[in-house]
């Protein structure tokens, strides 16, 4: 079994762990509706970069 030669200090341990935190998804505001969506993804209404790229069912 591996055993450390010198004990790591709390500071060194915590500095190593400083990059382990998770970040939330990056969101953008849709130009046409003002709705939030994931960046580089088509919004739920079928728009991408201000252009209609996917036909969606109408709610009528």
UniProtKB/Swiss-Prot annotation:
Keywords, sorted A to Z: Ribonucleoprotein, Ribosomal protein
Region (Disordered) residue spans: 1-60
GO cellular component, as recorded: large ribosomal subunit
Superkingdom of source: Bacteria
UniProt cross-references to InterPro entries, sorted A to Z: Ribosomal_bL32, Ribosomal_bL32_bact, Ribosomal_zn-bd
UniProt keyword Phosphoprotein, yes or no: no
Example of a GO MF term: structural constituent of ribosome
Pfam families in the cross-refs: Ribosomal_L32p
Any one of the GO BP annotations: translation
Biased composition (Basic residues): 7-16
Family membership noted in the UniProt record: Belongs to the bacterial ribosomal protein bL32 family.
HAMAP family (UniProt xref): Ribosomal_bL32 (MF_00340)
Identification of the protein by name: Large ribosomal subunit protein bL32
Source organism of the structure: Francisella philomiragia subsp. philomiragia (strain ATCC 25017 / CCUG 19701 / FSC 153 / O#319-036)
